[in-house]
Amino acid sequence: MNATPRIASLFDSLLEQKGSDLHMSVGYPPLGRIRGELVPLREAPLSVPEMESLLFELINPEQKRQITEDLDLDFAYGYGTKARFRANYFYKMTGLGAVFRTIPSKVLSLEDLKTPEVVRKLADRRSGLVLVTGPTGSGKSTTLAGMINYINHTRPAHVLTIEDPVEFVHESQKAQVTHREVGPHASSFATAIRSAGREDPNVILIGELRTNETMKLALQLASFGVLVFATVHTNSAPATIDRIINAFPAEEQGQVRGMLAESLAGIVAQQLLKTADGKGRVAALEILVGGSAIASMIREGKVFQIASKMQAGQGQGMQTLDMHLERLVKDNVVTPEAALEKAQDKENLAKVISRLKPDWEVPEALKSI
């Protein structure tokens, strides 16, 4: 469906300011997330009739039926040649609302994203489970798209993506890339993942591991010789491992530990921070690389030891989030305050920053940490 001038003006305003999200709520003006901050895109608040008119003009009759019956709708919207958006419609106390997340029209390469070499090595794997994790809006999809883009341009492989909705569209290069969307192409993630095993894939991207059923299916595929990429909403590598194991009943957790220990290739946990110059955002990455030592810790239930292993595993490309935050502060990419806001051990990082920058004073709000 074509955007009318009313909503097109909001999309254009967001894109001109390099915003990441458009928030629309009844009783408030449309808000854009610009460099991490929500700012009004116009002064006038949205009324109920205006909201429904603006949002319904973008969807087809089947989608209107879905939002009316399910009270929730996810879909991808192509705004001409300018951009794609991942849209979520939902109902709340004040009525219909929506969030549109910008999907860059160009798939950024790993070089564009300035990811460390170890991320490319994870994409070079021929099998195993690679998880990209972080909170909503931390750039997980962008990092995964960069890894798929790398595979697409470097080797002949069948790459299958299963998403809800499809975000980045990859045109086949050296690889054959097949996109499947939950809803139009499959009834559920689980159904699509089961079917994937019969579609001769070398690489599978699963938009999100939401249930223990999809987690187990992903682990099985990874152990069968497929390279599986997926996202999880967790803030660190150890928390990701715990999240997967704890998603299962106690009687199944031993088996899941074994499967995860065998198949885990790596975890990239990321956070987005505003840059020190205020002109953009940068990703801080925690990186875990699977291996015999990590596998033993997972099997033996010693996940609490993994952070220490990452600190000692720099030769393998491993790092904790705080290690990367320290480097970003040292290189003046981010401010000490921005780094401390995301740090896992705020007290320790504050001490490290004080040594790096003797003239820096810990803000009063942080002295009680």
What do these predicted ranges mean?
Residues M1-I369:
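Short, flexible helix-loop junctions that flank or precede catalytic/ligand sites
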